[in-house]
Each structure stands twice: as C-alpha cells, then as structure tokens.
C-alpha cells in the first residue's frame, strides 16, 4: 500500500544509515519495484564508506556489469584511511584499556577530572579528542556501529558540553545504538540528547525546532522497540508543548505514530484520558495530514460514524502491516480499536443486537459474543448478555455531576497550551522551508 507509505517523508529527517533498515523492510513487503529500491540503496551508499555493501548492491542491480573502477579505488582509499586512523588512535585506546582508567570513568562524573587524570598518568592531550572523534565517525561511516558507539562514549565522557563536536557526537551515539538494536542504551542516549537540545541557549529558535524535528523522527526507532516506549512517546509528543509544536509545524505525519501509541497503550485509564486530548490535535491538523489511522479516531470520536470507523479499521490493517515502525503493533491495535468501537457504541445505545455489534466489529456473531463475554468479565462492564434474544443490555452508566466537572476542567490547561502553540505556529510558518535537514549533510551523523 504505497499510498500511505511515509518512508520518503521520514527519511528526509534521518541520517542515511538509519534509512537502510526502512529500505530493507520495503524490499520484503514488495510494495515498490525492487530495482528502484536497489538504486535507492546505492544512492545512499555513495556518500558512506560501506564500499563492500555498495558493491553487493551494485551486483544485484547490474548483474551483467563489472564493478565500476571508481568503487574499487574508493575501497582502496577507505582501507588506507582506516589503517592510518587506527595507528593514530591506538595509543589513545590503550589508555582507556588501563584498569585504573576504567575505574575512574565508572566512578567520576566530572569529565575535566578524568581528562586531568589521563593527562597526568598517560600524557593525554587535547588534540587526542579530535582524533578520537574522527576515528569514531569513520567507524560509523564504515558501518562498524559498535566501534563507533564505544569511541563516542569515551569522547562524550571527556568533552565539555561546549565542545564543537559535543552535540553531533550525541547524535552519532544514538544512531549507533539504534542500528545495533540496543534499546536500553538508545533510550538513555535519546533522553540525554533531548536534555541537551532543550537546555541549549546558543541555538536559534529555528535551529532548536529543526533539532527537535530530527529527534522526533529518530525516536520512533526507540519508542516502538523499548518496553516503555509507548508511554514515553505520548508524554513527549502530546504533552511537551515544544515537541507537539514541532510536529504541527514541521511533520504532522508523526500523528500516525502518536495515534497508534495511544490506541495500543496498555493503561486503560490513561488511554481514555489521553484520547480526548489526541482527538483535539487530530481535528486541528486534519487539514494538513490524515490517513486511515487518524481518520479511524475522527470517525469514532468526532463523527460517531461507526460504519466509517469499521471501514477505516480494515484500511488500518494494511497501513500497519506495511509500516516499518508499526507492524509489530497490529494485534494490539485491532483488539483495542474494537474495544473503542464497543465502548463508544455502548454509550449511545442501551440495548444492542449482538449481530449488529459483530458487523461493527468485523466479526462473526459467535466470535462477537465470546469477545463481549470476555470483555464484560475482564473489564467488569455493567452489562448482561441475553443469548436467547441475541442482545447485550447495558447497565446504567450515568456519570456523576462531580465527575463531569472534573472531566471538563481537566482539559483547560491543554486548551491553553494549544492556543499558545497556534500563535507560535503562525510565527514559524513563514520560515518553515529555510530549516536545514540531516539529509543535506554529506555523510555520517553530522
């Protein structure tokens, strides 16, 4: 289902190395021409040092042609550069292998103290930091992400936050951990990078907006793989004004991922409250972005169009199956979406035909009855099933005036936040196209 594929939009905000997993996924799904995907990989590889990978892709794309001489020459050059950097970095690496240095790194949080210790014991010099950074970046460009992560960790521990390479080293460390699928480490790096961006007083508002936009896209890898990711994505994307503003201004397509995280969230009470806030954002941005996932929420909670919601739910399956980040959420999404339809339908109708519910839930009457029985048992819903008549009879779920007041006042802060962001959004729109992108960089993480 190429119509709803977001790979091109998302790739615009990713480092080129992070795009490769997305292209591999598309190859398996076969929704694009295979040769076009191979050509896309080759174009991405042209500005990296992964020459062997580029040669393999070239062979797949042009089986009847010889490997270009330029590629072979580039391989020779890369190997020579790697050997030279290894020789320059070897004495530095030996310092970090020293047991006493390892203990110091684990026990001290002060990079200056560690630097002074290395300078005193091993003759460590300031220029070694630049050498370490260049070697880490070169390792990354060659596809050796474990080596890059290790050296970038050493670099981060030693440099002050004001160092010219400090921020880009954080991006590189995060990318390396993502590509190695070390989700706990990636979550730590994501948090550290977010704090650095949010506390940066030097960057202009436009630069900060761009950095947050990159962070939003890179974070998708972490949030949809880490056990706590679906909670964290809601907190960051929906309830932190600067990030919600970035989504609305620069990348409204991210609403697909926020909506999926809300629908698949395992905390039922939190999910119901968050949905109300999410619906407001989806309504507000419906003129700039919509897909079956956001339209499902709109059909159900804005229009109360159950037939439309059922149709969109079927379309959601195709979208989820073909989305790199969301494919693992399919079962949770369908199960919870059916629950939402059921809950909303029950609020409107006192007595419901099981066959009608089955139709709304895209199930057989027998499946629907079993599903509702389990739902009533597990969720303790105030309802009874009349198997003889084939009806579900709802209990009295009247909301107390006290609860109504609480629900109405809960959204006041959120509405104020939305008003403030709308004003800021209008201010930023004129300069939207001027923002730099990672895709414009030559290679690597900066």
Swiss-Prot record:
Where does the PCI domain lie? Answer: 222-399
Q: Where is this region: Disordered?
A: 425-446
Alphabetically list the UniProt keywords: Cytoplasm, Initiation factor, Nucleus, Protein biosynthesis
Gene Ontology biological-process annotations:
formation of cytoplasmic translation initiation complex; translational initiation
Q: Where in the cell is it found?
A: Cytoplasm; Nucleus
The UniProt GO MF terms for this protein read:
translation initiation factor activity
- Listed GO CC annotations: eukaryotic 43S preinitiation complex; eukaryotic 48S preinitiation complex; eukaryotic translation initiation factor 3 complex; eukaryotic translation initiation factor 3 complex, eIF3e; nucleus
A Pfam family (short name) is eIF3_N
**Assembly description:** Component of the eukaryotic translation initiation factor 3 (eIF-3) complex, which is composed of 13 subunits: eif3a, eif3b, eif3c, eif3d, eif3e, eif3f, eif3g, eif3h, eif3i, eif3j, eif3k, eif3l and eif3m.
Family affiliation? Belongs to the eIF-3 subunit E family.
Q: What role does this protein play?
A: Component of the eukaryotic translation initiation factor 3 (eIF-3) complex, which is involved in protein synthesis of a specialized repertoire of mRNAs and, together with other initiation factors, stimulates binding of mRNA and methionyl-tRNAi to the 40S ribosome. The eIF-3 complex specifically targets and initiates translation of a subset of mRNAs involved in cell proliferation.
HAMAP family, from UniProt? eIF3e
Q: What is this protein called?
A: Eukaryotic translation initiation factor 3 subunit E
Organism of origin is Xenopus tropicalis (Western clawed frog)
Q: Which gene encodes it?
A: eif3e
